[in-house]
Amino acid sequence: MEKPIKPGRVTALACILMLLVIVFVVALYKLQIVDGKAYYEENRNSVASSQTVEAARGSSLDRYGHVLVSNTSCNNLVFNPDDLFEQDDPNGILLQMARTVAACGDTYVDELPVTAKPPFEYTDMNDTQRTQLKGFLKYAGLDEEATAVELMSYCREKFEINNNYSAADMRIIAGLRYSIKTRYIDKLYLPDYVFVQDASMELITSLKENNVPGFEVTVSYTRQYHTNLAAHLLGDTGKMNAEEYTTYKTQGYPMSATVGKDGAELAFEKYLHGTNGTAIVTKNASGTVTGTTYTKEPEPGDQVSLTIDLDLQAAAEQSLTRGIENMKSKSTETSDAVGGGALVAVDVATGQPLAIANYPTFDLQTLFQSQESYDAVKDAENEPLFNRALLGQYSPGSTFKPCTAIAGLTEGVITTGTRIQCTGTFRKYEDTGYAPKCWIASSGATHGNDNVTEAIRDSCNIFFYTVGDSLPIDTLARYAAAFGLGEHTGIELPESTGQMATEAVKKKVENTNWYVGDSLQAAIGQSYSLFTPLQLAEYCATIANGGTRHSASILKSVRSYDGSELIYENQAEVLSAVETSDYNWAAVQKGMYLVANDRAGSAYETFGDYGVKVAAKTGTAQLGDNQVNNAIFICYAPYDNPKVAVAVVVEHGSAGASIASIARDFLDAYFTVKTVDTAPESELSLLQ
């Protein structure tokens, strides 16, 4: 039996419904009648547009997760041409903006390559500025050879710049109008013009408080360097030029995209570059953003981990700097000649670079702060921007002798028991007028009757002249190539391949014939052989591990932006192998051990009492009359269980023995670092 509905409940329900209807009617009345006009005006003056949302670039880390490069967001000022040129005096507004920028201590991007004051002249231009100017001159109908004065005269007339403005103010206005105009010139492919990059809040507030029209504030990312180390490796980023755009546009890059310009930033662009998103942005009549709706979320770039160990990189740079500056400070006949240098350390088992140092170097954090700061580095003594470790090419000197030894042993020219008498002079071709001497002959001494191990210890030229005389130069070159000398190392950064001295190389360099003397000099690391410090380090690692040459890839791994997903992990890649017997390797390795541990060895003074047994070879690369020789040094350690191989080069360093202390200084740090935990507490904590 159904219960009867009580009259009180019906009344209450009716009252609630009536109240809801009244509220709805009042709200509708307010919306349509009271506020309707205001909403209409707001909607009529609102503008919705689809905008690109820049994706954050991925971070670069060292092998243990220390952050090397990441992002920081910044506010940029860009012009709104539609708004700007609706004003009565756009030129006056531009000048007002420029003055406000200066008053707030900010700087704006001035692209016009003309001096700030008369007499107007062109300033130095980079390739992008030159292309931009050429395109503008063509658009203006001016001759390519038009002077800066003619260009400024055209700008004053074209942009209707009042004659009441001073020449300096006219130049400011013309420069800004030039930057705006060139964005609309066909086929120039210029990125969007950013008036002020990383604008201060003082500047933004000042412009807004004074109701200055014609500009917008956008947010972008700039690279933040967390270290002043590895400047030649990390690289930098920037907006694309026209040539780069032709490459990247097929990959979906917008013209305004930031891309890697060199170093790891360029080499690993495909990982570091994120995918931009899009959003519908609504602005009111005053240009204030009133709403943002993402239609496609931006996808940040990936984390790239390099093989570099930040602690070892610091040690390498400090050791190299300390060693070279100490050499420069000594009052000797050769100290003034000491130039730049490089130190490279690689993992013996994998070939991975652990540290790549150059002297002199620079700081990426300050390099591009201004044109003046860049020019100061560019024009500094000994070319700090030059990556000697990868691009410098040096004769190896006696550090090449282990290669000659392996070639001679493997080809049967000598055995581990073969002894060759050092007489101070190689007399076989004396009747032709050619009789090269051993380095020790200048003191009236000889090395005696050396086997291959002792010859490496003594660096006896006569021994290696004899071996080289019995080896066809192409055979010796084949072994050099197997060691990676004169070959690509596999590193992803720009490098020189160098060259091994051969008949073909001499023909190319000097267009002259190959003589027996060339073969003898090539066997001791002179002649036309030129190798990079990175190649020498990998060569040393190949000796240490018994003949396996690995790629010098600098990429360790790639992870997703938040580190949660492993995208790529580098595996040691074998590029070539030097095949010979174990006892041949043992003989050569023992010879290098004696260089550092026998009193007759050239590196004994540095390593004789060292706590870790080191195998080494010194080299002196002769540069000709009246020039101080280059110093070359290679080593690996520990001798009985090789872990790290090191190559050091100092331009005009006189002799390899004189730079062995640089390698020892680095090894001190290496064996200290390896006894402690080098990883940060949390990889991801550094990226939050």
Residue ranges and their predicted role:
Residues V69, N75, K283-K296, I308, ...:
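Beta-lactam-recognizing serine transpeptidase/beta-lactamase-like catalytic domain environment
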Residues A544, A596, R664-T675:
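Short amphipathic alpha-helical signal-transduction/dimerization elements
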Residues V289-G341:
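Conserved, well-ordered alpha-helix/loop/beta-strand core segments that scaffold catalytic motifs
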Residues N91-L95, R99, M201, T205, ...:
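Solvent-exposed, polar/charged alpha-helical surfaces in well-ordered, non-transmembrane soluble domains
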Residues M1-L272, N276-E297, E333-T334, V338-A342, ...:
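Membrane-proximal periplasmic segments of bacterial cell-envelope enzymes
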Residues V650-G653:
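Ligand-site clamp/hinge motif
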Residues Y245, H273-N276, N284-G287, E317-E325, ...:
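Amphipathic, well-packed alpha-helical segments that form the structural scaffold of globular domains
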